[in-house]
């Protein structure tokens, strides 16, 4: 028997527990309970259904708080403890054995037993060995990796007892431990509890069965929320050596106020493992949740890559045309009057300006071009011999026409790359062939290198190029006025000065501004601003899809919290702090988004590679990929916080009683 001279380990004075209040009727289920329990006692609290025994057990195990009264544990007033201090007490002092076993269905027997040690910060190797040893002593050495649904009721209750002993189990709280078992399994469980009492554990047995209660050393009867009897039996605890070395250690209550729990990094691996297992078990739902994040991340990457690729193509095209290029054409004066006329004399004067290096008049129009039985409407570009130099464009085959050929109206033509492929698909070198342009035959003397379209203009590869004077005389019916003039500034720094000098010169010669001047740099700026706007719009659409994915994560996590409410209660009963539950569900949400973000990046790169294959301009940015991935993770953090916070704030008693 336990000496009554010892100070009580647990001391209850005037404990009352009320439920309801506010707009609901208040109900008191415990009415001034006074109870002392000493270390090493094997005590049974017996009562019928509704007597208040389960409520008393919840208060004893620090799963709930009394409405009034005093609860002292090892001399400390528990009513002053915060939630983390109560979690420490459950983790270090108590071990729970429930009627419904309360094992986490996704974990193996050993993993269920390890749970209290995870929150106690025990190293993985030591934790696994201790769990295996406890299960071995309880006759379950061959069931370490079995899930709860692969165990009998008696075996599940043994796992529950092993879990209660994992952190030492100074006090074993057994709530109807034989209620769901057959008589044989029930007898085995009671024998184990007697052995625990004999090994020095304090065992508190909650039961409605007086025969079961009679196996304890002390029986306390509770009825209608009051203790009506407290008697001592003649039963002695079992002296079997099975659990003599269960790992009891002294409790230092001062640690309750100092212990900060398991460091985040130490339990991270276990949390990720558990989260990954839950994701795998619910893989269809997880996949559908991931889909929103995957599409969002991939959309951001692909859309911004297309925007950047298009922007880069504009820069390359405009750059290849020359950022020192300016364009001039006739215009209607702002004051009214006829369209201005730019003469050759005007061009000669412009060419003499020191800020100008080249002047190139251009006439161009779609003309019917024929070769044998193939004819096409093609843009015929008529310009002086300096065109390749002005536009920084090389000849791929043959040559470009010369100044002499231009001056002598030579009927020669240079083909754009696509025109060459269109008219001569099977000919490796078309030089020497003839095309009929309008009604005039022209000899092919060269093919330009592939170039593409200048943004906002016709594709240069779809053109043919003829001398300026030959074009005026042979194709454009002696047209005197050029359609527009291309001018090249002496340097990029002089573009603005050159434009002002041309404007001043022509104003002096014409007396009015009947012309229009633009430069490639201004066009480039306009084009880039347009592309940037489009890119921002594309990015916004992609960001919205990522936001929708985040909302999907939140919905699924809220559903997960509801489905796993009992698991949350089990973890709290085994010593998890609010922070532990919060971090667990936050990590689960982030793991979903990290996985989705990773798959999204891979999908985005894959789609981008296909777009490149289809010749769509795409430029991937490592920064965009990192940003999209980071946004996915932050989305998981933000949208996972509310479900995680909901889980962390659950009442342990309510959580344990959920179905």
Swiss-Prot record:
Membrane topology: Multi-pass membrane protein
Annotated GO MF terms: ATP binding; ATP hydrolysis activity; transmembrane transporter activity
Localization per Swiss-Prot or TrEMBL: Cell inner membrane
UniProt-listed Pfam families: ABC_tran, FtsX, MacB_PCD
Keyword terms: Antibiotic resistance, ATP-binding, Cell inner membrane, Cell membrane, Membrane, Nucleotide-binding, Translocase, Transmembrane, Transmembrane helix, Transport
Broad enzyme group: translocase
GO cellular component: plasma membrane
Biological processes annotated in GO: response to antibiotic
Transmembrane segment boundaries: 287-307, 538-558, 594-614, 619-639
PROSITE patterns: ABC_TRANSPORTER_1, ABC_TRANSPORTER_2, MACB
Entry's EC annotation: 7.6.2.-
Domain of life assignment: Bacteria
Residues given in the record as ATP binding sites: 47-54
Stretches assigned to the ABC transporter domain: 10-249
Family: Belongs to the ABC transporter superfamily. Macrolide exporter (TC 3.A.1.122) family.
Subunit structure: Homodimer.
Protein role: Non-canonical ABC transporter that contains transmembrane domains (TMD), which form a pore in the inner membrane, and an ATP-binding domain (NBD), which is responsible for energy generation. Confers resistance against macrolides.
Protein name: Macrolide export ATP-binding/permease protein MacB
Lineage: Bacteria, Pseudomonadati, Pseudomonadota, Betaproteobacteria, Nitrosomonadales
């Amino acid at each position: 028997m336990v000496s009554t001279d010892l100070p009580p380990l647990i001391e209850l004075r005037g404990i009352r527990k009320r439920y309801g209040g506010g707009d609901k009727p208040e109900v008191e289920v415990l009415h001034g309970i006074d109870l002392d329990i000493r270390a090493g006692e094997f005590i049974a609290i017996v009562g019928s259904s509704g007597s208040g025994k389960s409520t008393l057990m919840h208060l004893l195990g620090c799963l709930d708080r009394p409405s009034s009264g005093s609860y002292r544990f090892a001399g400390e007033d528990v009513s002053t403890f915060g939630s983390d201090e109560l979690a420490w007490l459950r983790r270090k002092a108590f071990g729970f054995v429930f009627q419904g076993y309360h094992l986490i269905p996704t974990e193996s027997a050993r993993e269920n037993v390890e749970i209290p040690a995870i929150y106690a910060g025990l190293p993985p190797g030591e934790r696994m060995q201790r769990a295996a040893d406890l299960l071995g002593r309880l006759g379950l050495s061959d069931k370490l990796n079995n899930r709860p649904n692969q165990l009998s009721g008696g075996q599940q209750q043994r796992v529950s007892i092993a879990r209660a002993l994992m952190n030492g189990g100074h006090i074993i709280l057994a709530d109807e431990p034989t209620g769901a078992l057959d008589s044989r399994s029930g007898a085995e469980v009671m024998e184990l509890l007697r052995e625990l009492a004999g090994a020095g554990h304090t065992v508190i047995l909650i039961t409605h069965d007086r025969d079961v209660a009679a196996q304890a050393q002390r029986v306390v009867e509770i009825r209608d929320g009051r203790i009506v009897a407290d008697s001592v039996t003649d039963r002695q605890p079992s002296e079997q050596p099975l659990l003599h070395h269960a790992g009891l250690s002294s409790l230092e209550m001062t640690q309750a106020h100092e212990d900060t729990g398991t460091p985040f990094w130490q339990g991270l691996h276990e949390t990720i493992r558990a989260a990954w297992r839950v994701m795998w078990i619910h893989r269809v739902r997880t996949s559908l949740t991931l889909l929103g994040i995957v599409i969002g991340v991939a959309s951001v990457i692909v859309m911004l890559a297309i925007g950047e690729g298009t922007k880069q193509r504009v820069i390359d095209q405009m750059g290849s045309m020359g950022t020192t290029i300016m364009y001039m054409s006739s215009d209607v004066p702002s004051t009214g009057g006829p369209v201005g006329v730019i003469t050759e004399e005007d061009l000669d004067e412009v060419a003499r300006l020191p800020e100008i290096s080249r002047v190139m008049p251009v006439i161009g129009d779609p003309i019917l071009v024929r070769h044998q039985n193939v004819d096409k409407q093609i843009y015929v570009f008529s310009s002086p011999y300096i065109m390749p130099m002005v536009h920084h464009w090389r000849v791929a085959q043959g040559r470009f026409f010369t100044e002499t050929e231009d001056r002598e109206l030579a009927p020669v033509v240079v083909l754009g790359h696509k025109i060459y492929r269109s008219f001569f698909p099977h000919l490796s070198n078309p030089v020497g062939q003839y095309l009929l342009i309008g009604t005039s035959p022209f000899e092919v003397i060269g093919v330009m290198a592939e170039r593409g379209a200048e943004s906002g203009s016709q594709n240069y590869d779809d053109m043919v190029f003829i001398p300026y004077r030959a074009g005026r005389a042979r194709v454009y019916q002696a047209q005197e006025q050029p359609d527009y003039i291309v001018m090249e500034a002496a340097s990029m720094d002089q573009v603005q000065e050159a434009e002002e000098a041309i404007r001043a010169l022509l104003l002096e010669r014409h007396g009015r501004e009947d012309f229009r001047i633009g430069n490639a740099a201004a066009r480039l700026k306009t084009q880039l601003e347009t592309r940037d706007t489009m890119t921002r719009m594309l990015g916004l659409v992609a960001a919205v899809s990522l936001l929708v994915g985040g909302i999907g994560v939140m919905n699924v996590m809220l559903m997960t919290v509801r489905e796993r409410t009992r698991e949350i209660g089990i973890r709290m009963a085994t010593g998890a702090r609010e922070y532990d539950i919060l971090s667990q569900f936050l990590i689960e949400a982030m793991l979903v988004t990290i996985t989705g973000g990773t798959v999204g990046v891979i999908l985005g790169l894959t789609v981008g590679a296909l777009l490149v294959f289809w010749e769509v301009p795409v430029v991937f940015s490592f920064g965009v990929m990192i940003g999209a991935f980071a946004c996915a993770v932050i989305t998981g953090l933000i949208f996972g916080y509310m479900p995680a916070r909901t889980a962390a704030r659950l009442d342990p008693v309510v959580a344990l009683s959920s179905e």
